[in-house]
From Swiss-Prot:
SUPFAM superfamilies (UniProt xref): Class II aaRS and biotin synthetases, tRNA-binding arm
EC id: 6.1.1.20
Keywords for the protein's UniProt record, in alphabetical order: Aminoacyl-tRNA synthetase, ATP-binding, Cytoplasm, Ligase, Magnesium, Metal-binding, Nucleotide-binding, Protein biosynthesis
Protein name: Phenylalanine--tRNA ligase alpha subunit
Protein localization: Cytoplasm
């Protein structure tokens, strides 16, 4: 019987070397060590042995089982490694193949212009301030020298939510909020970019558009300071050869007030259809902060002065890129947007 066990061991070890797959290895294991396996069958013969022979024979069978199981583990590791290498070879990526190119995205022209405006004024020492788009009547009008019976309110057809709450018509409320928050610290030197809303819709107007307003409050601020800031901005935005002019105007929150024109980018001031033959194009409104607005912000108008300005980002973008219809900026036509 010992010879039979040794024969099973030798034959099994030989077959292990011939097995080439993990499936065949498992089948061989069941054939030898399974419940009906050849080595298991030898254990059933122990009943016919004498009590003295049984432990000796049992030890032989167990030693053989240990040898075969160790051999199985080694062979399984070898086959697993071989299978893995084969799989890696079959799934190997050819890095010489050209990659699939993806379409490149583009910044929206309004985003580009807003970021450029911010960068220019940050370089001049201004800080960015933001505020809510849903605003109170007080901050949007009254604190800006526009009481409820002021005729200038008719100039802005507003979107009211309640009698006292509306979508802001300008970013100027941020200036009042910043003055209240910052007082008595000086200087106040901010720009306020953001969305504003007015009930207007045509080729040059949109019910939602973007503004950037600026405010500087300190001692001895003069109109010449405002002009110098806006001249520097215009040249950095539209080119070093640009000039500006200030025309008298009216805004309730500034006194004196001025419209700011820049020399035409197309004709250089000679006159063309873009500037309507004048050589100048209006770009923003500005002026010295009205004393009442300073008082509403918590500052002494007898000790301090300031200037403010405001521009429509869409208008700046239209002038910078030669866009004739504002609605193109909101149509989401990729053929148009990919030009920028």
């Amino acid at each position: 019987m010992k010879q039979e066990v040794h024969r099973i061991q030798e034959e099994t070890l030989a077959e292990l070397q011939q097995v080439s797959t993990l499936e065949a290895l498992q089948e061989l294991k069941v054939k030898v060590l399974g419940k009906k396996g050849s080595l298991t069958a030898q254990l059933r013969k122990m009943g016919g042995l004498s009590p003295e022979e049984r432990p000796i024979f049992g030890q032989v069978v167990n030693e053989t089982r240990d040898i075969l199981e160790a051999a199985w583990i080694r062979r399984e590791e070898e086959l697993s490694q071989t299978a893995m290498l084969k799989q890696l070879e079959e799934e190997k990526l050819d890095i010489s193949l050209p990659g699939v190119s993806l379409p490149q995205g583009h910044q929206h022209p309004l985003t580009k212009v807003i970021e450029e405006i911010e960068e220019i004024f940050l370089g001049m020492g201004f800080q960015i301030a933001e505020g809510p788009e849903i605003e109170s009547d007080y901050y949007n009008f009254e604190a800006l020298n526009l009481p409820k019976d002021h005729p200038a309110r008719e100039m802005q057809d507003s979107f009211y939510i309640t009698e006292e709450i509306l979508l802001r018509t300008q970013t100027s409320p941020v200036q009042i909020r910043t003055m209240e928050k910052q007082r008595p610290q000086l200087p106040v030197k901010i720009i306020c970019p953001g969305k504003v809303y007015r009930n207007d819709d045509d080729a040059t107007h949109s019910p939602m558009f973007h503004q950037v307003e600026g405010l500087m409050v300190d001692r001895r601020i003069r109109m010449s300071d405002l002009k110098g800031i806006l001249l520097s901005f215009s040249r950095m935005m539209f080119g070093e050869s640009r000039e500006i002019r200030l025309r008298p105007s009216f805004f309730p929150f500034t006194e004196p007030s001025a419209e700011v024109d820049v020399s035409c980018m197309l004709c250089g001031g000679a006159g063309c259809r873009i500037c309507k033959g004048t050589g100048w194009i209006e770009i923003l409104g500005s002026g010295m902060v009205h004393p009442r607005v300073l008082e509403m912000g918590g500052y002494d108008s007898k000790e301090l002065t300031g200037f403010a300005f405001g521009m429509g980002v869409e208008r700046i973008a239209m002038l910078k890129y030669g866009i004739e219809d504002m609605r193109l900026l909101f149509d989401n036509d990729l053929r148009f947007l990919q030009q920028f």
